[in-house]
Amino acid sequence: MTHQMHAYHMVDPSPWPLTGALSALLMTSGLTMWFHYHSVILLLLGLTTNILTMFQWWRDVVREGTFQGHHTPIVQESLRYGMILFITSEVLFFTGFFWAFYHSSLAPTPELGSYWPPVGVYPLNPLEVPLLNTSVLLASGVTITWAHHSLMEGSRKNMLQALLITILLGVYFTLLQMFEYYEASFTISDGIYGSTFFVTTGFHGLHVIIGSTFLLICFIRQLKFHFTSNHHFGFEAAAWYWHFVDVVWLFLYLSIYWWGS
């Protein structure tokens, strides 16, 4: 065994970056096959490979940080910077969608009748399901903060309770969004309004599903006593991500549902 004289974690050789890249190739190729040839076999193979890769890669990270003690304070600081950069990239990702929406809505083209929303499109009422969804996500922001404070104070029971409520609120939000899509009178093919609406809200919904899964993993880990009051970056990263999802929804609600309608 080699002996290191520094606090950094030298990662062991791993096959997961290779299988992750392969799964990305399979998924993108599978999407093309699905769109043009109506075959989902390659897409399902890519999704399966991707899920298996993520599970085993994050399993290794949990082992290294929780059981082997490789996540020293300086490593945790690096992970924090990495998460901040990741969330920053996500902010820019959604900025592109908001830019497309405002570019189209502030100066509607003659093809749209120089009017927004376009003629023939009947927007959703912002005071119905969208307002309920806003309340649900704001409540989940409160409960995830409650969970974080409970963890810092060493109250495991309250932390688990608050985290479970947050996960249930995330699932409830997703179900409401599905109901909203089902009831909408327009589709993604209804011009620029339909495409910007469904792409922006759809990607946000995907982030809610990812965040709910992230929190569910944290819940399972806490059941196994993985987190302490001074060693819980996995949960902290999930909380940051969830707050980011909340803030994006507020901008989305005010821009697309309220002002855009």
From Swiss-Prot:
Mitochondrial intermembrane side residue ranges read 35-40, 106-128, 184-190, 257-261
Q: Name one GO cellular component term.
A: respiratory chain complex IV
Top-level taxon in the UniProt lineage: Eukaryota
* EC number(s) reported in the record: 7.1.1.9
Report the enzyme's class at the first EC level.
translocase
Q: How far does the signal peptide extend, from start to end residue?
A: none
Q: Which PROSITE patterns match?
A: COX3 (PS50253)
The alphabetized UniProt keywords are: Membrane, Mitochondrion, Mitochondrion inner membrane, Translocase, Transmembrane, Transmembrane helix
What this chain does, per the entry, is described as: Component of the cytochrome c oxidase, the last enzyme in the mitochondrial electron transport chain which drives oxidative phosphorylation. The respiratory chain contains 3 multisubunit complexes succinate dehydrogenase (complex II, CII), ubiquinol-cytochrome c oxidoreductase (cytochrome b-c1 complex, complex III, CIII) and cytochrome c oxidase (complex IV, CIV), that cooperate to transfer electrons derived from NADH and succinate to molecular oxygen, creating an electrochemical gradient over the inner membrane that drives transmembrane transport and the ATP synthase.
Complex formation: Component of the cytochrome c oxidase (complex IV, CIV), a multisubunit enzyme composed of 14 subunits. The complex is composed of a catalytic core of 3 subunits MT-CO1, MT-CO2 and MT-CO3, encoded in the mitochondrial DNA, and 11 supernumerary subunits COX4I, COX5A, COX5B, COX6A, COX6B, COX6C, COX7A, COX7B, COX7C, COX8 and NDUFA4, which are encoded in the nuclear genome.
| Family of the protein in this entry | Belongs to the cytochrome c oxidase subunit 3 family.
User: Which protein is depicted?
Assistant: Cytochrome c oxidase subunit 3
